[in-house]
A protein has these predicted regions:
Chain A
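Periplasmic/extracellular loop-to-transmembrane helix junction in inner-membrane transport proteins
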Residues: 3-16, 20, 41-102, 122, ...
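Cytoplasmic-entry segments and transmembrane alpha-helices of multi-pass inner-membrane transporters
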Residues: 18, 109-148, 186, 313-318
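Membrane-embedded alpha-helices of multi-pass transport/permease systems
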Residues: 40, 108-115, 132, 143, ...
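Transmembrane alpha-helix signature in integral membrane proteins
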Residues: 85-116, 229, 298
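Generic hydrophobic transmembrane alpha-helix motif, especially the helices
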Residues: 134-179
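Interhelical loop and adjacent transmembrane-helix boundary motif
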Residues: 157-159, 243-293
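Transmembrane alpha-helices
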Residues: 186, 195, 203, 209-246
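C-terminal transmembrane helix and the adjacent membrane-cytosol boundary/short C-terminal tail
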Residues: 188-192, 196, 203, 230, ...
Length: 318, 282
């Protein structure tokens, strides 16, 4: 009897157990799906409800509007007003500006650090640097934001004479600090994943360490580095607390990086808590949430895609 | 938690004392916190009574009063003519009692030579018509605007009282909380900000003139409660008719020195003693 303990009654148990574990695995996926459905559902009235559309239709969010008779048409985000204005363009511009600065700041530093630790650093040095950079990822963004608000803004203003203390550069640099560990980790992994046989071949051909790194390892790992950059970009777009505190949150249309910006994520964080439930403003905030969700989802998907392609290539599957 | 406590209290009391007074308070989001504190303190002293406080905005509260679904409406503005008329049509006679005061200070950097501004100048500055300090008699420097997020009562109050409901300039940088505004202005020589009274640390309060000819007044507890500081307002409770019984006891307690001290604890400004006494229901 003992021998057949798992048969035949336990077939069912096995089946249930397996499905249960599968369900656990699916839970995250279902969670994301439900979250997306919920967010999108709250944004739907923008497309269906006449009354909401009068205040905030898709075209009103995209194009210049004449809000008061006899005044110039403009893009404006002023949801609490006698004439509520829901132009998304200033917010979009702010989001992109912050992310661009973050990338300009973070990519050279993170990639440089990755090249150094994976190619040139001694073992001890690597064991020292890697955890420290990765520790940055654990830094709460509210702490980084506060640092940018109080310290970094003053330093930048004193050094470069900015008119506006809180601006896209200040927020972007702080964002960059948050993004560095992401890019660094992925890029470093990609370089380490370059097969030893390739390096050995290069060395055998008489290449010095610089030549090995820059003509051999770097090109081979480039897709991985690109994936890191893309994932970092995704984080820079979605990051909230840092921009909320360090950017000044003024929704303006301007190409200058020395002026204040307002991002999608900071707008949601700042306004959702007190918005009238079910109002057009509420719907618009959820619409912004949907946009952010789609942006970051697509960006992360792209990053993963590049990463998988790289793995296949390095393993000689394609 | 506090609201939960109130609800739990409500349920318990409903079981124990069938005759207990059950009071609902609804309205202004600016006043929710104060209403809740008052309710808690009052219930501590009067275990038999049950008070439920909720927000939603002054307009919501007034609508609830007109529809007869609340006993007390909290409002951060006086009722409008139109609302009085609506109430009359429904057989409601609103009775207004000012219960506390609220004021907003304008902050400037300590290095800024400007010390006083008129309400008109402030409006010009915050709507973006005046963009340079020299236009108000200061240095030839760009004015850097700081304000609160649009979900804050302070934002709405300033917009209403100083900007006459016009929009803030798009360039206004909004920060989470008065502390952040004060911090920003303290570090920005050409900055200007606004926020609650008695917050100015590391920045200076700007004296405000009602118009060109009137005297400049600094925001203090005294000038606000004395009525001379221009950016201040009364906060009201509205009842249906002159309150009696439990309602009367509650409003008189809120106006008592004890109730006014609670208001001060949660950063509102107490009414001057004589006004508070005058406002009490006989």
């Amino acid at each position: 009897m003992e021998k057949y303990r798992f048969k035949p009654k336990s077939r069912i148990r096995e089946f249930i157990g397996e499905k249960f574990i599968a369900l656990n695995a699916l839970a995250a996926l279902i969670g994301i799906l439900l979250i997306f459905i919920f967010i999108f559902k709250e944004a739907v009235p923008i497309f269906t409800d006449r009354e909401v559309q009068e205040e905030a239709s898709l075209s009103k969010m995209l194009y210049k509007q004449v809000y008061y008779e006899g005044r110039e048409p403009k893009w404006s985000w002023q949801p609490i007003s006698t004439v509520p204005k829901y132009s998304l363009l200033p917010l979009f511009l702010g989001t992109i500006k912050a992310a661009i600065v973050a990338m300009l700041f973070a990519v050279p530093l993170a990639v440089g650090a990755a090249i150094y630790t994976s190619e040139f650093a001694s073992r001890r040095m690597r064991e020292f640097i890697k955890p420290i950079i990765e520790l940055l990822a654990g830094l709460p963004s509210v702490v980084l934001g506060f640092f940018a608000l109080v310290v970094l803004a003053t330093v930048l203003q004193k050094s470069f004479g900015f008119t506006f203390r809180l601006n896209a550069i200040n927020a972007g640099v702080a964002l960059g600090i948050a993004v560095i560990p992401i890019i660094f980790t992925v890029a470093e992994d990609a370089m380490n994943a370059v097969p030893k046989s390739l390096r050995d071949a290069a060395i055998a051909l008489g290449a010095n360490p610089w030549q090995v790194s820059f003509t051999m390892v770097l090109p081979a790992a480039l897709p991985g580095i690109a994936a890191g950059v893309v994932l970092g970009f995704g984080r820079a777009i979605g990051e909230t607390m840092i921009v909320l505190m360090a950017s000044g949150n003024a929704a303006i249309i301007s190409a200058r990086f020395t002026e204040s910006i307002r991002t999608f994520s900071a707008t949601i964080a700042a306004e959702l808590a007190e918005v009238v439930f079910g109002s057009p403003h509420y719907n618009v905030l959820f619409f912004i949430g949907t946009l952010l969700f789609i942006f970051t989802f697509v960006i992360n998907l792209g990053g993963d895609f590049i990463l998988n392609r790289l793995k296949e290539r390095l393993q000689g599957k394609s | 938690m506090k609201r939960l406590a109130i609800v739990v209290g409500l349920v318990l009391a409903a079981f124990s004392i069938a005759l207990a007074g059950n009071i609902t308070i609804k309205g202004s989001d600016t006043l929710v916190r104060l209403g809740q504190r008052w309710a808690e303190e009052y219930m501590k002293g009067n275990p038999g009574s049950v008070i439920q406080v909720s927000g939603g905005g002054s307009g919501t509260g007034i609508a609830a009063l007109i529809n007869g679904t609340t006993d007390i409406c909290q409002s951060s503005r006086p009722m409008k003519e139109r609302e009085y008329k609506l109430a009359q049509d429904k057989g409601i006679t609103p009775h207004e009692v000012a219960v506390a005061l609220d004021g907003i200070a304008v902050f400037l950097n300590e290095k800024n030579p400007i010390a006083e501004l008129t309400l008109t100048q402030l409006k010009g500055i915050y709507t973006g018509v005046i963009t340079n300090w020299k236009e108000v008699g200061g240095a030839d420097r760009r004015i850097i605007l700081y304000g609160r997020e649009n979900n804050s009562g302070t934002y709405a109050f300033f917009k209403e009282h100083v900007l006459n409901e016009e929009d803030y300039a798009d360039q206004t940088q909004t920060l989470p909380g008065t502390a952040a505004v004060v911090n920003a202005v303290s570090k920005d020589e050409w900055g200007i900000g606004y926020g609650g009274i008695a917050w100015a640390k590391g920045v200076k309060d700007c004296a405000v003139k009602k118009d060109d000819t009137s005297q400049a007044v600094l925001p203090t507890m005294e000038t606000v409660s004395g009525g001379s500081y221009p950016i201040s307002r009364e906060l009201y409770w509205y009842f249906n008719g002159v309150p009696t019984g439990e309602l009367k006891a509650l409003v008189n307690w809120a106006l008592s020195p004890e109730g006014q001290k609670v208001a001060e604890e949660v950063d509102y400004i107490p009414l001057p003693k004589d006004v508070a006494e005058k406002n009490m229901i006989e």
